[in-house]
Protein backbone atom coordinates (compact mmCIF):
# COMPACT_ATOMS: atom_id res chain seq x y z
CA UNK A 1 0.00 0.00 0.00
CA UNK A 2 1.53 3.27 -1.03
CA UNK A 3 0.49 6.74 -0.03
CA UNK A 4 0.80 9.66 -2.36
CA UNK A 5 1.26 13.18 -1.06
CA UNK A 6 -0.02 16.15 -2.98
CA UNK A 7 2.85 18.65 -2.77
CA UNK A 8 0.48 21.62 -3.03
CA UNK A 9 -1.48 20.53 0.07
CA UNK A 10 1.42 19.22 2.15
CA UNK A 11 2.50 21.27 5.18
CA UNK A 12 5.73 19.32 5.66
CA UNK A 13 8.97 21.27 5.53
CA UNK A 14 10.91 20.10 2.44
CA UNK A 15 14.13 21.60 3.86
CA UNK A 16 13.90 19.76 7.20
CA UNK A 17 16.78 17.43 8.13
CA UNK A 18 16.21 13.71 7.79
CA UNK A 19 14.82 12.13 10.97
CA UNK A 20 17.25 9.43 12.08
CA UNK A 21 16.69 8.21 15.69
CA UNK A 22 19.96 6.23 15.64
CA UNK A 23 21.89 9.42 14.97
CA UNK A 24 20.06 11.15 17.84
CA UNK A 25 21.03 8.35 20.23
CA UNK A 26 24.71 8.71 19.33
CA UNK A 27 24.87 12.44 20.17
CA UNK A 28 27.30 13.15 22.99
CA UNK A 29 25.55 14.56 26.07
CA UNK A 30 25.90 18.31 26.66
CA UNK A 31 27.65 18.95 23.33
CA UNK A 32 26.52 21.86 21.12
CA UNK A 33 24.64 19.45 18.83
CA UNK A 34 22.93 17.89 21.88
CA UNK A 35 21.90 21.32 23.17
CA UNK A 36 20.50 22.24 19.76
CA UNK A 37 18.44 19.03 19.68
CA UNK A 38 17.14 19.51 23.23
CA UNK A 39 16.01 23.07 22.56
CA UNK A 40 14.44 22.43 19.14
CA UNK A 41 13.05 18.87 19.26
CA UNK A 42 10.36 17.95 21.80
CA UNK A 43 10.75 14.27 20.86
CA UNK A 44 14.49 14.28 21.61
CA UNK A 45 14.02 16.19 24.89
CA UNK A 46 11.41 13.67 26.11
CA UNK A 47 13.54 10.74 24.91
CA UNK A 48 16.66 12.05 26.68
CA UNK A 49 14.82 12.82 29.94
CA UNK A 50 13.24 9.37 30.00
CA UNK A 51 16.56 7.67 29.26
CA UNK A 52 18.49 9.72 31.82
CA UNK A 53 15.93 10.06 34.59
CA UNK A 54 17.25 10.75 38.07
CA UNK A 55 14.90 8.26 39.76
CA UNK A 56 17.77 6.05 40.92
CA UNK A 57 18.69 8.68 43.52
CA UNK A 58 15.37 8.26 45.28
CA UNK A 59 16.38 4.87 46.70
CA UNK A 60 17.81 4.78 50.23
CA UNK A 61 20.96 2.80 49.34
CA UNK A 62 22.20 5.10 46.59
CA UNK A 63 21.48 8.17 48.69
CA UNK A 64 23.48 6.80 51.64
CA UNK A 65 26.45 5.98 49.37
CA UNK A 66 26.43 9.54 48.00
CA UNK A 67 26.23 10.90 51.53
CA UNK A 68 29.25 8.82 52.65
CA UNK A 69 31.30 9.92 49.63
CA UNK A 70 30.40 13.54 50.31
CA UNK A 71 31.50 13.21 53.96
CA UNK A 72 34.80 11.60 52.89
CA UNK A 73 35.41 14.42 50.44
CA UNK A 74 34.81 17.03 53.12
CA UNK A 75 37.03 15.20 55.61
CA UNK A 76 39.87 14.85 53.09
CA UNK A 77 39.81 18.54 52.15
CA UNK A 78 41.51 21.00 54.51
CA UNK A 79 42.82 18.26 56.78
CA UNK A 80 39.40 17.58 58.30
CA UNK A 81 38.98 21.09 59.73
CA UNK A 82 35.53 21.51 58.13
CA UNK A 83 34.39 17.99 59.03
CA UNK A 84 33.75 19.10 62.62
CA UNK A 85 31.34 21.87 61.60
CA UNK A 86 29.25 19.88 59.07
CA UNK A 87 26.70 17.45 60.47
CA UNK A 88 25.03 14.53 58.75
CA UNK A 89 21.69 16.33 58.83
CA UNK A 90 23.24 19.29 56.98
CA UNK A 91 24.64 17.00 54.30
CA UNK A 92 21.35 15.14 53.92
CA UNK A 93 19.32 18.35 53.66
CA UNK A 94 21.79 19.79 51.13
CA UNK A 95 21.61 16.69 48.92
CA UNK A 96 17.81 16.62 49.11
CA UNK A 97 17.73 20.27 48.10
CA UNK A 98 19.97 19.52 45.08
CA UNK A 99 17.73 16.64 44.01
CA UNK A 100 14.63 18.86 44.30
CA UNK A 101 16.30 21.52 42.16
CA UNK A 102 17.11 18.91 39.49
CA UNK A 103 13.50 17.67 39.46
CA UNK A 104 12.06 21.18 39.27
CA UNK A 105 14.33 22.19 36.36
CA UNK A 106 13.32 19.05 34.47
CA UNK A 107 9.65 20.02 34.88
CA UNK A 108 10.38 23.62 33.84
CA UNK A 109 12.07 22.47 30.62
CA UNK A 110 9.01 20.40 29.72
CA UNK A 111 6.47 23.08 30.73
CA UNK A 112 8.29 25.84 28.84
CA UNK A 113 7.42 24.25 25.50
CA UNK A 114 3.89 23.17 26.46
CA UNK A 115 2.46 26.65 27.14
CA UNK A 116 4.35 29.03 24.92
CA UNK A 117 1.62 31.63 24.39
CA UNK A 118 0.05 33.96 26.92
CA UNK A 119 -3.28 33.02 28.55
CA UNK A 120 -5.19 35.87 26.89
CA UNK A 121 -4.83 34.10 23.52
CA UNK A 122 -6.26 30.88 24.96
CA UNK A 123 -9.65 32.46 25.67
CA UNK A 124 -12.55 31.57 23.42
CA UNK A 125 -13.52 34.20 20.88
CA UNK A 126 -17.22 35.00 20.78
CA UNK A 127 -18.80 36.07 17.51
CA UNK A 128 -21.53 38.60 16.99
CA UNK A 129 -24.81 36.67 16.49
CA UNK A 130 -25.84 39.11 13.75
CA UNK A 131 -22.72 38.36 11.73
CA UNK A 132 -23.53 36.72 8.40
CA UNK A 133 -21.01 34.15 7.37
CA UNK A 134 -20.20 34.37 3.66
CA UNK A 135 -20.56 30.70 2.89
CA UNK A 136 -23.80 30.32 4.87
CA UNK A 137 -25.39 33.54 3.68
CA UNK A 138 -28.32 31.75 2.02
CA UNK A 139 -30.14 28.91 3.69
CA UNK A 140 -31.49 26.45 1.16
CA UNK A 141 -34.41 24.35 2.32
CA UNK A 142 -36.18 21.63 0.36
CA UNK A 143 -39.78 22.36 -0.76
From Swiss-Prot:
It comes from Arabidopsis thaliana. Contains a PAM2-like motif, which seems to be involved in the binding to the PABC/CTC domain of PAB proteins. A motif (PAM2-like) lies at residues 11-21. InterPro entries: CID1/CID2. Signal peptide: none annotated. This is Polyadenylate-binding protein-interacting protein 2.
Amino acid sequence: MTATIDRRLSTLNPNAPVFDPVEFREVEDFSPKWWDLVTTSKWFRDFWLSANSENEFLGGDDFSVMEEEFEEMIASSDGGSMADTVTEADVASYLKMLLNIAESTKEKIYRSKVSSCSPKYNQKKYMNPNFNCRRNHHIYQPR
